[in-house]
Amino acid sequence: MSGGLDVLQMKEEDVLKFLAAGTHLGGTNMDFQMEHYTYKRKSDGVYIINLKKTWEKLLLAARAIVAIENPADVCVISSRNTGQRAVLKFASATGATTFHGRFTPGTFTNQIQAAFREPRLLIVTDPRADHQPLTEASYVNIPTIAMCNTDSPLRYVDIAIPCNNKGHHSVGLMWWMLSREVLRMRGTISREHPWEVMPDLYFYRDPEEIEKEEQAAAEKAVGKEEFQGEWTAPTADFAQPEVADWSEGVAVPSVPIQQFPAGIEGKSFTEAAAPSKAPAAAEGFAEDWSAQPATEDWSAAPTAQATEWGGASADWS
């Protein structure tokens, strides 16, 4: 299908992407019409899909999509959850019309319906899960493209792209590859430069997994805040008041000034700052008990005070 052109050949990086996403892994059952798309069977019973034929059918599907003049006439459908995000991304990149979720029966055949559509091309993710739109497309002669596994029925399918349509990584990568080839064939992007859109944007994410990741991130943020609040001292506020007019006096905070008693003129600062000694009468009984008392000399002659109270010459009669 590449016609021997080097620009259309499958690159090594594309093969690595296919292998990493598990696109080459089929199912354990085999449909007789999908037999020529398989390479071999492993010992555990899983069929291996030939990626060379996957690439050729991918280019054929991209050429069929580019042949439609109005991109809105291309209808893409995925009833499985694994392909709904990829379908929306494909429609956003190429301008196609998307039906994600449940397909309303009669959309292609019942003209009385408000949601009646007449697409020129139909692309489905799984022929078994999306059998209703395939059946209705056969009634109104709409060509169909389907991503088929080894056990997928090929009834009403015009272009089958052999791949693993069960894994969400494989489905997202296949829609990403199809989007890139369509844009390259339209001339929107160049083949010489890699496409800046990552395949991760096409992968399905479980809502419970997203909720768990958000909860874990919130708990981590709360724990980090508690750790910082416990060990980090609060920052002091050193904001100074702004002075608009420097001619006005700046308010100075009140500072207690030490009061000195009168009569300290002519004294040094140390003498003035030292506490003055109060008179002995004012101290009362506040004596210094730590001082050593004077030792009396009992051998000395009695003093006048002793004579006043009486002594050897006192008359006690």
UniProtKB/Swiss-Prot annotation:
UniProt-listed HAMAP family: Ribosomal_S2_euk (MF_03015), Ribosomal_S2_laminin_receptor (MF_03016)
Site residues by UniProt (Cleavage): A115, F116, P133, L134
GO molecular function: laminin binding; laminin receptor activity; structural constituent of ribosome
Family classification: Belongs to the universal ribosomal protein uS2 family.
Protein name: Small ribosomal subunit protein uS2
Species the sequence originates in: Salmo salar
GO CC aspect terms: cytosolic small ribosomal subunit; nucleus; plasma membrane
Spans annotated as Disordered: 271-317
Biased composition (Low complexity): 271-284
Post-translational modification: Acylated. Acylation may be a prerequisite for conversion of the monomeric 37 kDa laminin receptor precursor (37LRP) to the mature dimeric 67 kDa laminin receptor (67LR), and may provide a mechanism for membrane association. Cleaved by stromelysin-3 (ST3) at the cell surface. Cleavage by stromelysin-3 may be a mechanism to alter cell-extracellular matrix interactions.
Gene that produces this protein: rpsa
Pfam families noted in UniProt: 40S_SA_C, Ribosomal_S2
Keywords, in A-Z order: Acetylation, Cell membrane, Cytoplasm, Membrane, Nucleus, Receptor, Repeat, Ribonucleoprotein, Ribosomal protein
Assembly notes: Monomer (37LRP) and homodimer (67LR). Component of the small ribosomal subunit. Mature ribosomes consist of a small (40S) and a large (60S) subunit. The 40S subunit contains about 33 different proteins and 1 molecule of RNA (18S). The 60S subunit contains about 49 different proteins and 3 molecules of RNA (28S, 5.8S and 5S). Interacts with rps21. Interacts with several laminins including at least lamb1. Interacts with mdk.
Function: Required for the assembly and/or stability of the 40S ribosomal subunit. Required for the processing of the 20S rRNA-precursor to mature 18S rRNA in a late step of the maturation of 40S ribosomal subunits. Also functions as a cell surface receptor for laminin. Plays a role in cell adhesion to the basement membrane and in the consequent activation of signaling transduction pathways. May play a role in cell fate determination and tissue morphogenesis.
